[in-house]
Amino acid sequence: MHQTVHRVFGHLFKFCRIAGGTYTPSSGHSLCILKGISLLRGTDEYGPMGNMKENKKSSGTQSIWMGSSVEAASRPLDRSLDTDVCIVGAGIAGLSTAYSLSCEGKSVVVLDDGPIGGGMTERTTAHLSNVIDDGYVTIERLHGKHGARMAADSHTAAIDRIETIVVTERFDCDFERVDGFLFPAPGHPPERLEEERLAALRAGLVGVERIERPAGPVLETGGCLRFPRQAQFHPVKFVTGLAQAIERCGGRIFTDAHVSTVKGGQQARIETRQGHAIVAQSVVVATNTPVNDMVVVHTKQAPYTTYVLGAGVPKDSVPVALYWDQADPYHYVRIQKDAAANGHDLLIVGGEDHKTGQANDGAQRYQRLEHWARKRFPMMEQIEYRWSGQVMEPTDGLALIGRNPDDTSNVYIATGDSGMGMTHGMIAGMLITDLIQERANDWAALYDPSRKSLKSIGTFVQENLNVAAQYADWVSAGDIGSEDQIPKDSGAVLRSGVQKVAVYRDEEGTVHRRSAVCPHLKCIVAWDSIERTWNCPCHGSRFDAYGKVLNGPANSDLSPIET
């Protein structure tokens, strides 16, 4: 464990040295930091949601998108293969890349250990926007005016590309162009909105205007900005359509194929847990967060959990649009037409973000989110969906798309979605295709995973100190004193001698024990009582109640307990 902390601090030191900092990764210094920061985790005894629909895919809650797609002809991998490009991950980033490459004649193999779109793609709220989450004032400060223009251009192009694919391939995925409305945070001076409007215009967005109030809801007083030509769609229907189009172009998609090893070289080699291997000219790892990178990329982004409610509203009572505010954490809202149980529209509201694995108070967060929503949407009916998703937040606000740092030139990654996974995923499809085809791309430097943004060093240091602090859990007591205190369908971390044990009691009362040590970089996992998962507070790895890995960067299950 001590060696792992040093690896994290070693990368912190390298970054600080480049920026002129003075941090020294000495043993005493790192231990002082660990002693000086205490971690408090709340407890949450909130049981299963009254209206929650069971999901056996990626976690314990179910989004509106789950279970609504037509199956593509995916199948388990039963043999080794050669191909031009192997893509690991069948979400929007992986399938967008596979679609573009297969349309250009490349032979493509896609591998995923779950169903198509079964990761974070089915847990998004599917806003398609060129309004950067961190705001253009921040993006311009961190990346300059040219960088802000490239960010605006790439997200605009991503929406246009999605629309073109929908029309060309005739996808039935509820794609619709809508306006977006950005509201100020409570108490923010009105100048903030005007600064953001001017920065957006400098970045090249067209038609951004300040209005006193939209035709629909008012999230906060003080006016708002209207951004035209945003969009929304049904994400699982879209990626299912992509999968079918890929297969029509000769691409092959294999599910239930857990990739255990990714090796670059003159030819890349991708090995699966089942013992098969794919040999490819290039490999793209598009798994939300890379499973082939131990440290470097994970010091440049941080995992956050975000919460979503879906509630019926009378038809046409809320105009179809995207709505956001500038609160911290911010709220985001959209409408899905005719999607409520009674045929009404479904209001989708998200927010209440926190660092993954560092809070277990999901019930309270849902309650706060509901209170916020009902105050602004008094027509809200019964809540029909509650779900959460994981967002990878890069320290400088933009995704990490391109060649994997410290790797061979034929290994590519797409990560750091920053709450804009749908457009960043499509950007990955366009950018990585150009890189593999050896074409110039104006966005390449902006999204380069090896970039160093010195202006974001404060966030970089803060996030990595937060990671280091989590190793204090090694010397802390367990969540409770005895596994007898664990109710059915719940879990807790217990101390057993020098070991930390993740204990889950299933609905029948049977106890299941796994090591609580995350196999990625040895942090201690925490129980998530809403999703019924074990979550790593360092880099966001997630495991089901029985210890099976769901999300990277960990690439293996929680270990059995040694007796």
Describe every region a protein language model picked out:
Residues L225-Q274, Q281:
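Helical element adjacent to the flavin cofactor pocket in flavoenzyme catalytic cores
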Residues I139-A245:
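Rossmann-like flavin
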Residues L309, A492-T563:
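Rieske [2Fe-2S] iron-sulfur-binding domain
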